[in-house]
């Protein structure tokens, strides 16, 4: 069976590709290389909101365009292909989870603001002492009248330095089994008890943070779903996040740039793509890109019924293979390019930044070692590793 996009989906893809091709100014792109969540990022997302582009995969009843999950993947892939940042956590995980489990007040307050590019969320799950074992989290939320009082610390909270809200996992019942006593609260980052410190990663950019909650007051109506039923929301949100971490557009971006560079003779008169090893490397990158695209379509099309093992497998494949694609690209550009030539130097700089940035996603949404355990236990029914 040959699986491909319909003519209508191809048309949508072309429209989105054209839209993204001139969305970002050079100054905005330069600023976002150092801070992916600052003023330039905000301006770009608001622009997409004004243009009605953020709701491609959202149902019309929530203000979206009413397309399906494949069209949403097209949107995400084309954004990554053009190196355009998206409010991915907000748009693709928090938004859909609120649509399914949020109160009417929460839907009315947050969903239109998300589609307008005005509301930005960060995910507060990981803790210094718990790591990927989310069920061992210690951040507490104690009921006090019509508020919860939150105390604790999170780490690797991406975008928290610029977020309007934190989607926070808290322990609301210390006596319950560790998976049972967790709730999800929406924390307003304007609360005086909220603070953060930056964590600068390998690419030199400010993506993520440690976040602190010191007697933060959260209104009871900012509890998502039922109290102590947060684990179900966490797994729903994380399954969606894992699919979005390995979009095929990451591969397409590498392929497009390196293929274009390799097709032009260098200063020495040699055209890199004439060499067999360059053709092999580009062929492998293109093949990985296509496989990842098909995996994303398959898993995304499951919608709310997304399988945990499938989401984890997609995440592992995409995040690890994009590392290989980056290494293959750097090898051929380093071998056949001259760093003294501006185009080659810029491509090498870009590839280095991409490789370092893509390293981060191997542990976003759960480290890949844990993902493999989930694939084995949930997908292959292999007994879990004793701890």
UniProtKB/Swiss-Prot annotation:
GO terms for molecular function: FAD binding; oxidoreductase activity, acting on the CH-CH group of donors. Changing residue 241 to Q: Unable to dehydrogenate pregnene-carboxyl-CoA ester. Its cofactor is FAD. The keyword Transcription does not apply. Pfam families: Acyl-CoA_dh_1, Acyl-CoA_dh_M, Acyl-CoA_dh_N. It is an enzyme of class 1 (oxidoreductase). The keyword NADP applies. Disulfide bonds: none annotated. Belongs to the acyl-CoA dehydrogenase family. This is Acyl-CoA dehydrogenase FadE29. It comes from Mycobacterium tuberculosis (strain ATCC 25618 / H37Rv).
């Amino acid at each position: 069976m040959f699986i491909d996009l319909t003519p209508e989906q191809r048309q949508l893809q072309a429209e989105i590709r054209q839209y993204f091709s001139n969305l970002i100014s050079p100054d905005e792109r330069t600023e976002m290389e150092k801070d992916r969540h600052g003023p330039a990022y905000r301006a770009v997302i608001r622009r997409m909101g004004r243009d009605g582009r953020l709701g491609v995969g959202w149902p019309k009843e929530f203000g979206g365009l009413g397309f399906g999950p494949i069209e949403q993947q097209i949107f995400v892939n084309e954004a990554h292909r053009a190196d355009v940042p998206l409010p991915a956590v907000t748009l693709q995980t928090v938004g859909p989870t609120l649509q399914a489990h949020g109160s009417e007040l929460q839907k009315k307050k947050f969903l239109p603001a998300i589609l307008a590019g005005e509301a930005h969320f960060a995910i507060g799950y990981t803790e210094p002492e718990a790591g990927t074992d989310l069920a061992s989290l210690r951040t507490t939320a104690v009921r006090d009248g019509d508020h919860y009082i939150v105390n604790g610390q999170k780490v690797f909270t991406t975008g928290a330095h610029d977020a309007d809200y934190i989607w926070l996992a808290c322990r609301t019942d210390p006596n319950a089994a560790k998976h049972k006593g967790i709730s999800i609260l929406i924390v307003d980052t304007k609360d005086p008890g909220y603070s953060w410190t930056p964590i600068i990663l390998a690419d030199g950019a400010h993506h993520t943070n440690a976040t602190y909650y010191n007697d933060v007051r959260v209104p009871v109506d900012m509890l998502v779903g039922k109290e102590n039923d947060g684990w179900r929301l966490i797994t729903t949100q994380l399954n969606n996040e894992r699919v979005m971490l390995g979009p095929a557009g990451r591969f397409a971006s590498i392929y497009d740039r390196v293929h274009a560079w390799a097709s032009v003779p260098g200063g020495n008169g040699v055209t890199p793509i004439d060499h067999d090893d360059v053709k092999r490397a580009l062929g492998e990158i293109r093949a990985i890109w296509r496989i990842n695209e098909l995996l994303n379509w398959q898993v995304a099309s499951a919608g709310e019924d997304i399988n945990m093992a499938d989401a984890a497998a997609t995440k592992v494949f995409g995040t690890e293979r994009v590392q290989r694609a980056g290494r293959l690209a750097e090898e051929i550009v380093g071998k056949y390019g001259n760093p003294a030539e501006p185009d080659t130097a810029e491509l090498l700089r870009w590839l280095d930044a991409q490789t370092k940035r893509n390293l981060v996603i191997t542990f976003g949404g759960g480290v890949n070692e844990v993902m493999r355990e989930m694939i084995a236990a949930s997908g292959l029914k292999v007994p879990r590793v004793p701890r």
